[in-house]
Swiss-Prot record:
Belongs to the universal ribosomal protein uL6 family. Part of the 50S ribosomal subunit. Residues 151-177 are annotated as: Disordered. Keywords: Ribonucleoprotein, Ribosomal protein, RNA-binding, rRNA-binding. The keyword rRNA-binding applies. It comes from Fusobacterium nucleatum subsp. nucleatum (strain ATCC 25586 / DSM 15643 / BCRC 10681 / CIP 101130 / JCM 8532 / KCTC 2640 / LMG 13131 / VPI 4355). Residues 152-177 have a biased composition (Basic and acidic residues). This is Large ribosomal subunit protein uL6. Pfam families: Ribosomal_L6. InterPro entries: Ribosomal_uL6-like (IPR000702), Ribosomal_uL6-like_a/b-dom_sf (IPR036789), Ribosomal_uL6_a/b-dom (IPR020040), Ribosomal_uL6_bac-type (IPR019906), Ribosomal_uL6_CS (IPR002358). One of its GO terms (biological process) is cytoplasmic translation. Disulfide bonds: none annotated.
Length: 177
């Protein structure tokens, strides 16, 4: 039995939740999210709690049950609190600056890396080396952060590159002379 799927989701005050034909819409102070789910899963709002139920115990249904509950929980948390990923630039001459609603990053290439404006994402830069990525959709915030990190991932010898703020880089010893 899915333990994740059985847990009810509390709907905080200030968040509106609606389901129509398995299309879930969540509105909150930070924004609105809409997502369509598998039509075999039943989603109900009762007494300020969202419950997710499945029709049977087939392995596919058990998997979808827990996933659906987790995605709805992420939607509710996103419109209520929002999500933030923080990236740190490590290296001489590595710096970032906001450019309009986008981002311009110098990562040691012959040209600056430009990240265009992404709907639903807000960039902020602190001290030229810390990038904050904010948004209501957890998946989108994480994907944008991963795309920026992929422009220059941290290397294991000096640790130079773009890394998550809470990421620990395993360092290697240089060659012995």
């Amino acid at each position: 039995m899915s333990r994740v799927g059985k847990k009810p989701i509390a709907v905080p005050s200030g968040v509106d939740f609606s389901v129509k034909d398995n299309v879930v819409t969540v509105k909150g102070p930070k924004g609105t999210l809409t997502k369509e789910f598998n039509n075999n899963i039943t989603i109900k709002l009762e007494d300020g709690h969202i419950t997710v139920e499945r029709p049977n115990d087939e392995p596919f249904m058990r998997a979808i049950h827990g996933t659906t509950r987790a995605l709805i929980n992420n939607m509710v948390k996103g419109v209520h609190e929002g999500y933030r990923k923080t990236l740190t630039l490590v290296g001489v001459g590595y710096r970032a600056a906001t450019k309009g609603k986008g981002l311009e990053i110098s990562l040691g290439y012959s040209h600056p890396v430009i990240i265009d404006e992404i709907p639903g994402i807000t960039f902020s830069v602190e001290k030229n080396t810390t990038i904050h990525i904010d948004g209501v959709e957890k998946e989108l915030v994480g994907q944008v952060a991963a795309n920026i990190r992929a422009k220059r991932p941290p290397e294991p010898y000096k640790g130079k590159g773009v890394k998550y703020a809470d990421e620990h880089i395993r360092r290697k010893e240089g060659k012995k002379s």
